[in-house]
Amino acid sequence: MPSTGTLVIIFAIVLILCIMLLFFYKAAEARNPGVLPPPIPPPTPPPPKKKYDHNEYMEKTDLEPEVKKNHRKWANEAEHLISSSVKGLENLDETAFLANHKGHGFRTFDHAKSLFKEFLKKY
């Protein structure tokens, strides 16, 4: 096994050679551009997402004309049902609710209300 002094000298020589090689490439690039490969350009950002347009979607679908004509009316009716469900939930009697939904996994009445509101936000 070589001594520590020998290892230090070998390491210093390798380090000096690496530095010299670096300067050689820098000088060669300055004299003759194109010797080194060009740097990799940064990735281009993705194009902005187009906002969802329900009317445009309905035009592209192959649904029957009757469905296309009435889809907005049906969507409004569904929205009305959901909003009335929320209002009904807010006015619901706590004891009646807990009596009807015993064993459904609701810890409290407020827990059930919060779960229902989360469900409505998702859909």
UniProtKB/Swiss-Prot annotation:
Residue stretches spanning the membrane: 5-25
Keywords: Host membrane, Late protein, Membrane, Transmembrane, Transmembrane helix, Virion
Its membrane topology: Single-pass membrane protein
Subcellular location field: Host membrane; Virion
Main location: host cell
Keyword Nucleus: no
Record's compositionally biased regions (Pro residues): 35-47
Disordered: region residues: 33-54
One Gene Ontology cellular component: membrane
Superkingdom of this protein's organism: Viruses
Induction profile: Expressed in the late phase of the viral replicative cycle.
Cysteine pairings via disulfide bonds: none
Family under the similarity heading: Belongs to the asfivirus CP123L family.
Annotated protein name in UniProt: Uncharacterized protein CP123L
